[in-house]
């Protein structure tokens, strides 16, 4: 199939909510980037595909881990053994998905990107998938995943701060996810709040320069930054258990 046909099939798979197949079609497209960089549309389709595939497993993992904690609290050892085994199966799927996109980013997408916007997009994506690994890995593997996340986000941030406007949806999405990393993986609420607040304040001060095409995307991410700040600042004073927001919607909202 041609590049155009693979893109069309990826859109069809998205409509049918068959995200594993959407990933397959977009991987074929991504492997042609030696010739030509992915378009914004193609880049977003790839991101949406992977985000849905990983998102389902991340949700499953959280539910199963929560049940495991409850069963441990009840002293239900037989159930705990079964749950651990099942959780291991989900973790194997998570690892495979993350490894797939990280290989693709390293072999094709990051090296072929020339524009600042696409470099930040792919490096942010690299950070995101290392972060997803850090969510469930333990010991040395978790440390390695966290370090790789930091390196990717930092590289993306350096380019974003130099070349993208504070209101740019990709720069904002990066700040959002980087701050989530500080909060959830590194357990650094102060750093998380500072990063999110700075990104929000800088964007607010330049809101009047925002073009119509990215206004919706940028303001949506700014709202998520503010939601997290509210949650985190209340968490610093009390132990809250609400859900942290990250750049989701398949990350497509950041790439317009």
UniProtKB/Swiss-Prot annotation:
Keyword hit for Nucleus: yes
Main location: cytoplasm
Tagged with keyword Protein biosynthesis: no
Location in the cell: Cytoplasm; Nucleus
Induction: By wounding, drought and salt stresses, benzothiadiazole (BTH), ethephon, methyl jasmonate (MeJa), hydrogen peroxide, abscisic acid (ABA) and incompatible and compatible races of rice blast fungus (M.grisea) and rice bacterial blight (X.oryzae).
Disulfide bonds, paired cysteine numbers: none
InterPro entries: 14-3-3 (IPR000308), 14-3-3_CS (IPR023409), 14-3-3_dom_sf (IPR036815), 14-3-3_domain (IPR023410)
UniProt keyword annotations, A-Z: Cytoplasm, Nucleus
Tissue and organ expression note: Expressed in seedlings, internodes and panicles.
GO cellular component: cytoplasm; nucleus
Gene3D superfamilies, per the entry: 14-3-3 domain (1.20.190.20)
Biological process (GO), any one: signal transduction
Function: Is associated with a DNA binding complex that binds to the G box, a well-characterized cis-acting DNA regulatory element found in plant genes.
Sequence similarity: Belongs to the 14-3-3 family.
Subunit structure: May form a complex with the transcriptional activator VP1 and the bZIP transcription factor EMBP1.
Name this protein carries in UniProt: 14-3-3-like protein GF14-C
């Amino acid at each position: 199939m041609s590049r155009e046909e693979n893109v069309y099939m990826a859109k069809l798979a998205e409509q049918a909510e068959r995200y594993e197949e959407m990933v397959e079609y977009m991987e074929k497209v991504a492997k042609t980037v030696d010739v030509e960089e992915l378009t914004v549309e193609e880049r977003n389709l790839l991101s949406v595909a992977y985000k849905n595939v990983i998102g389902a497993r991340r949700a499953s993992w959280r539910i199963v881990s929560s049940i495991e904690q409850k069963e441990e609290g009840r002293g239900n050892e037989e159930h705990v053994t079964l749950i651990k085994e099942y959780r291991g199966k989900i973790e194997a799927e998570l690892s495979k998905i993350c490894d797939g996109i990280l290989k693709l980013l390293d072999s094709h997408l990051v090296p072929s990107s020339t524009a600042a916007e696409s470099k930040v997009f792919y490096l942010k994506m690299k950070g995101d998938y290392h972060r997803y690994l850090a969510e469930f890995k333990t010991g040395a593997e978790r440390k390695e995943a966290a370090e790789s996340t930091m390196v990717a986000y930092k590289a993306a941030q350096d380019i974003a701060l130099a070349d993208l406007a504070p209101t740019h949806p990709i720069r904002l999405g990066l700040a959002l996810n980087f701050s989530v990393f500080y909060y959830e993986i590194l357990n650094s609420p102060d750093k998380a709040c500072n990063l999110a607040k700075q990104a929000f304040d800088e964007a607010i001060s330049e809101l009047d320069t925002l073009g119509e095409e990215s206004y919706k995307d940028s303001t949506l991410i700014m709202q998520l930054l503010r939601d997290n700040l509210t949650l985190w600042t209340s968490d610093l004073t009390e132990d809250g258990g609400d859900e942290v927001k990250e750049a989701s919607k398949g990350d497509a909202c950041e790439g317009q």
